[in-house]
Amino acid sequence: MANNNVYSVLKSLLLLLHLVFLSKQHVDSASIVKFLPGFEGPLPFELETGYIGVGEEEEVQLFYYFIKSERNPKEDPLLLWLTGGPGCSAISGLLYQNGPLAMKLDVYNGTLPSLVSTTYSWTKTSSMIFLDQPVGTGFSYSRTQLFNKPSDTGEAKRIHEFLQKWLGKHQEFSSNPFYVGGDSYSGLVVPATVQEISKGNCQCCNRPINLQGYVLGNPLTDCVYDCNYRVPFAHKMALISDELYESLKRTCRGEYVNVHPHDTECLKFVEEFNKLTNRVCERHILHSCCETETPSCYSYRFMLTTYWANDETVRKALQINKESIGEWTRCYRGIPYNHDIKSSVPYHMNNSIDGYRSLIYSGDHDIQVPFLGTQAWIRSLNYSIIDDWRPWMIKDQIAGYTTSYVNKMTFATVTGGGHTAEFTPKETFMMFQRWINGQPL
């Protein structure tokens, strides 16, 4: 009887160990993807997808897409790209902004939407990791209930942990120059992540990451600048009259958000401003705010991507864990999230002091994060200019304007650009290529 009990206990322990072993099989998993449903033929680049577990028990499973540089992956820079949001999937970067694939904008007929190659992918010159973060974004998920909700500063730590583990499993890239990039809301998280990596590099027990700098497009940085400068931007772009602009300046004194409820005169003019601009497409003021879903509508690609990413053959090809999520959504707004970084300006200051390069660029037709606000917070850093405001060119054509500073920061506008890179793919690619190669714009 005793022997039977011992046998039963041993059997239970072996079963438990087996289950633990199986549970670890999807942790830190990686798969090479050679074909993707919707794309004709083999992929013309090397794609890897997988999960990296972070947290004390690796309960958070972060999903990534990794694409090797199409030029020289052994030596080219490695760029981690963080999509804004928070809660917007890395597919936004991969299929809309600076990746090697895009949705083919055909009328949806019930079949799987098609993918096409892009001409100006940043993977032409760098290896790229597109990361679904925070947890709950894209295909990332948690195996247990989280007691600490994600936050800006918390994400910086999780991303740092992700990178340490990812590079531990891809040691052939550990010596490559490493950069962090992103756009929109990532303007808060990326500088904090850079600082977190920099601090980690100084600690004895961490494997150093070959961090060189960061790149940000139309980055949300501080609402004091980003939000308040929407008014002068609208005036410069002829969206509001001279008279209204002067009235706003006089009554609001540069403070156009969180106006005191007793300041009725300022509120009156802010309301008039909102009425004049509420039908303007925020991400690009020259684009239409579509009311119908047609291929000519900017947001049509979002619908196509939703059909594509929720197709079972696509999920199988990407090796998506069935535990991950139900329906994939491009931007999941239901993530409990603590917005604990109100301004990333101090992080920029610290990163500059630590000697990291930075490229800050602005599409000049974005009213969400207008270039005027970005210029204002850069001025607040009070760095000396080494290359004053000048045009940067592509084949004798003005592609934008740029200024360089002694702290290794470069600011550039992109003429005709919007909130993200896809509005001007050639210009943003050429700008990035020159900067990442250490060339002047």
From Swiss-Prot:
What is the originating organism of this protein?
Arabidopsis thaliana (Mouse-ear cress)
Q: What family is this?
A: Belongs to the peptidase S10 family.
Q: In which tissues is it expressed?
A: Ubiquitous.
List the signal peptide residues.
1-29
Which Gene3D superfamilies does this UniProt record tie to the protein? alpha/beta hydrolase
The subcellular location is: Secreted
Q: What does this protein do?
A: Probable carboxypeptidase.
One Gene Ontology molecular-function label: serine-type carboxypeptidase activity
Disulfide-bond pairs as recorded: C88-C331, C252-C266, C290-C297
Of the GO CC terms on this record, one is: extracellular region
GO biological process terms held by the UniProt record: proteolysis
Keyword entries, A-Z: Carboxypeptidase, Disulfide bond, Glycoprotein, Hydrolase, Protease, Secreted, Signal
Q: What is this protein's record name?
A: Serine carboxypeptidase-like 4
- Entry EC number(s): 3.4.16.-
What's one Pfam family here? Peptidase_S10
UniProt main location, coarse: secreted
